[in-house]
């Protein structure tokens, strides 16, 4: 058996084009077999508006700190912590007086 090593596209940072997203840049790292992995870079006072997703999402905070909400609950999220967003539940991610770098892992729901 040989090791399967292949290139992947190197994508530059670009602003998230979604309406309601301000001060957030992203770059996709992987999009294959229903799995989507991206980095998000939040400026101070940046936000991704509240929205649901049909997929399950894990948000890992790599640097900095911010806030997340899931449904009616809100919590801080800091470097070294992760948030889990179940499918079809409105969620939001934002910063106030700090920047934040996250790794987002989105996969189809097991439901």
Question: PLM features: residue spans?
Answer:
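Conserved short histidine dyad/triad with adjacent acidic residue
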Residues: 36-53, 87
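Short acidic-glycine-tyrosine-enriched beta hairpin
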Residues: 72-88
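Short, surface-exposed secondary-structure edge patches
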Residues: 39, 58, 73-75
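A short, N-terminal "cap"/entry segment at the start of jelly-roll beta-barrel domains
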Residues: 1-34, 38
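Ligand-binding loop in jelly-roll beta-barrel domains
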Residues: 87-111
């Amino acid at each position: 058996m040989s090791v399967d090593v292949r290139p992947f596209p190197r994508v530059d940072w670009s602003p998230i084009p979604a309406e309601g997203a301000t001060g957030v840049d992203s770059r996709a790292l992987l999009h294959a077999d229903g799995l989507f992995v991206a980095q998000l870079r939040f400026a101070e006072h940046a936000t991704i508006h509240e929205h649901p997703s049909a997929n399950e999402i894990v948000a890992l905070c790599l640097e900095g700190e911010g806030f997340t909400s899931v449904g009616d609950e809100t919590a801080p999220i800091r470097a070294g912590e992760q948030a889990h967003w179940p499918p079809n539940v409105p969620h939001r991610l934002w910063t106030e007086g700090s920047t934040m770098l996250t790794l987002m892992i989105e996969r189809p729901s097991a439901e």
